[in-house]
Amino acid sequence: MYHPNMFESHHHMFDMTPKNSENDLGITGSHEEDFETKSGAEVTMENPLEEELQDPNQRPNKKKRYHRHTQRQIQELESFFKECPHPDDKQRKELSRELSLEPLQVKFWFQNKRTQMKAQHERHENQILKSENDKLRAENNRYKDALSNATCPNCGGPAAIGEMSFDEQHLRIENARLREEIDRISAIAAKYVGKPLMANSSSFPQLSSSHHIPSRSLDLEVGNFGNNNNSHTGFVGEMFGSSDILRSVSIPSEADKPMIVELAVAAMEELVRMAQTGDPLWVSSDNSVEILNEEEYFRTFPRGIGPKPIGLRSEASRESTVVIMNHINLIEILMDVNQWSSVFCGIVSRALTLEVLSTGVAGNYNGALQVMTAEFQVPSPLVPTRENYFVRYCKQHSDGIWAVVDVSLDSLRPSPITRSRRRPSGCLIQELQNGYSKVTWVEHIEVDDRSVHNMYKPLVNTGLAFGAKRWVATLDRQCERLASSMASNIPACDLSVITSPEGRKSMLKLAERMVMSFCTGVGASTAHAWTTLSTTGSDDVRVMTRKSMDDPGRPPGIVLSAATSFWIPVAPKRVFDFLRDENSRSEWDILSNGGLVQEMAHIANGRDPGNSVSLLRVNSGNSGQSNMLILQESCTDASGSYVIYAPVDIIAMNVVLSGGDPDYVALLPSGFAILPDGSARGGGGSANASAGAGVEGGGEGNNLEVVTTTGSCGGSLLTVAFQILVDSVPTAKLSLGSVATVNSLIKCTVERIKAALACDGA
């Protein structure tokens, strides 16, 4: 039966605002004030069902009754709201029983609380938008004043628009197009300029050995290398002290930012043309290597960062390949400093984002602009690192085609000495079908490389040390590693193959941390928690030390790191296969002590059988010695190879293989970095023959072949690096005997390798 007062009754049931000041509590004021002070959380109806139960013929009470919730009820409701702001019927009934409230009282409390939070957020956002609008209006007024007071640079009189020649008109159109893009980026950057950086990257001078750097490890999700915690720091290892570049750069000033934006736009245009243009900019030589025509380059790009400084040598290379990763995830890797330094940990020894000028638009990185600094290395103590201070700019050019460019900001650095600078360098990424992408990489560097050891100069001059081929080869291998780690259809034909997804993920995460830790001690970087002790005479053994405390990923105590590089007249592939083979391990590994080495577990990491993670067991001939496990990762690509290993605890590895957390497994990695010597040019299908990057040029090919060198294609540059715990007490003093022992160990290993590979006189 229809009752005319029924809907009026329901209206009063939902109306929480007192109609007059004569309520039971004496609450006065407007609805908004009542909402602000009571927030619907402290005041509610005494019996919300009372009006529905009234006789429909009776008039509803005009005066509704309210009562306050107790302090305990409010605390419980607030606590539950933080966990679940939208409780279901079952949860509301449970709360009503616990707090002695009606279910509808609980329901209305949550409704009012959500409304209050929404209103507070809207007011806060409105205040921010109003502040930004005021800033834009003020900036617009400054521009108007500047235009009204503009003067002619020639005569000093008022500026006037006169007749333009045909060429001048075209220049003005081109300038207008570039200015439009600059204004668009500036408008985006205006929203973010001046925002404080994250706590762990707020200021360079404050970085020290006690500075906490979050660990980054492979998260095994497409496009998510490392824990993306939005940190602006990307370290392969911990930072110890300030290197030259850390002392010479700072966050750019407000006056510098318009110039940075303009430079980034010009660099993007240059990179796209460098990646897509052939002759006469890139000239092909007889051995299919492209040489950059510097005269044509400066004629084509008269703008940019200026002429080449005296004393610097140009390196330019270009390389293309197809990788098994979609373009969106590739862009994310390049624009996130943590993921970038993790994926390229063998090249990037340290990276920092100084300031994010723009985060992009439309929920992606289109238009993203950030000022960065990075240190690039070769896995050898004999090759100095290269430090750059640059801006990185990402732009979508068309549907499915993106570009990321770096260009140095040396003009903003107070340091008068420039040892290395990046002309527009980066990559074009083209979307392909089935989740693949085509990557065209351009590296254009000007560097003072006179400090490079003579043994490594041929490698550096071919472009394999820092050129585009090394970047592309590393990216291709890492994409294969990620794709292999995510495979679900693993055949169980081999008992040593790990088929459990959880076990594979944990073991790969542990291996990745081992590789990254190895890279901190193998190169010439000084930006990590190592103190260099000495380089011992003609043997060129670089010894460093560090104290490990409160780090679950490393054993506590004093750790020594020793590294040395030498040349052997053996092809890189033969050296790589010898060092990664467990059957030949006893020929060089003192830890195996002549025992039988057996592979217990295995994870393939790509097409090449040399790319894998293995768990080895050393069965010592001494019955009194317990068996030992060794975690090993071997990887190879067209630019070089690694064999990295570390002794691990048996109990801890059982936890890892069961899918447990690998971050608490203590590791001290040792291993080898194998590079071609740069002497072979062309033929043989070798890694160094296909380097394709000369002093001024680089090769281009759609496919990167794996290392397939033969004995006739030149020798190898082998770097051996050990990390050894010499004292389990972190506060103990380092003894000279410990240094001598580590030196003896590394020399003995080198001699064993030379003898096993028959390198007499090497």
From Swiss-Prot:
Reported induction: Stimulated during seed imbibition. Induced by gibberellins (GAs) and repressed by DELLA proteins in an ATML1- and PDF2-dependent manner. Upon seed imbibition, increased GA levels in the epidermis reduce DELLA proteins (e.g. GAI/RGA2, RGA/RGA1/GRS and RGL2/SCL19) abundance and release, in turn, ATML1 and PDF2 which activate LIP1 expression, thus enhancing germination potential.
Composition-biased stretches (Basic and acidic residues): 30-39
UniProt region (Disordered), positions on chain: 13-72
Segments crossing the lipid bilayer: none
Keyword Transferase: no
Disruption outcome: Plants missing both PDF2 and ATML1 have reduced levels of L1 box/ gibberellic acid (GA)-regulated putative targets, including LIP1, LIP2, LTP1, FDH and PDF1, in the presence of GA and during seed germination, thus leading to a delayed germination upon imbibition. In plants missing HDG3, HDG7, HDG11, PDF2 and ATML1, increased cell division leading to cell overproliferation.
Subcellular location: Nucleus
One record GO biological process: seed germination
Keywords of the record: Coiled coil, Differentiation, DNA-binding, Homeobox, Nucleus, Transcription, Transcription regulation
InterPro entries with a match to the protein in the record: GLABRA2/ANL2/PDF2/ATML1-like (IPR042160), HD (IPR001356), Homeobox_CS (IPR017970), Homeodomain-like_sf (IPR009057), START-like_dom_sf (IPR023393), START_lipid-bd_dom (IPR002913)
SMART domains: HOX (SM00389), START (SM00234)
Gene Ontology molecular functions: DNA binding; DNA-binding transcription factor activity; DNA-binding transcription factor activity, RNA polymerase II-specific; lipid binding; sequence-specific DNA binding
DNA-binding residues: 62-121
Residue intervals of the START domain: 253-484
Biased composition (Basic residues): 60-71
The keyword DNA-binding is annotated on this UniProt entry: yes
Entry's Gene Ontology cellular component terms: nucleus
Complex formation: Interacts with GAI/RGA2, RGA/RGA1/GRS, RGL2/SCL19 and PDF2. Interacts with AIL7/PLT7, ANT, BBM and AIL1.
Function as written in the Swiss-Prot or TrEMBL entry: Probable transcription factor involved in cell specification and pattern formation during embryogenesis. Binds to the L1 box DNA sequence 5'-TAAATG[CT]A-3'. Plays a role in maintaining the identity of L1 cells, possibly by interacting with their L1 box or other target-gene promoters; binds to the LIP1 gene promoter and stimulates its expression upon imbibition. Acts as a positive regulator of gibberellins (GAs)-regulated epidermal gene expression (e.g. LIP1, LIP2, LTP1, FDH and PDF1). Functionally redundant to PDF2. Seems to promote cell differentiation.
Sequence similarity: Belongs to the HD-ZIP homeobox family. Class IV subfamily.
Protein name listed in UniProt: Homeobox-leucine zipper protein MERISTEM L1
Organism (species): Arabidopsis thaliana (Mouse-ear cress)
Name of the coding gene: ATML1
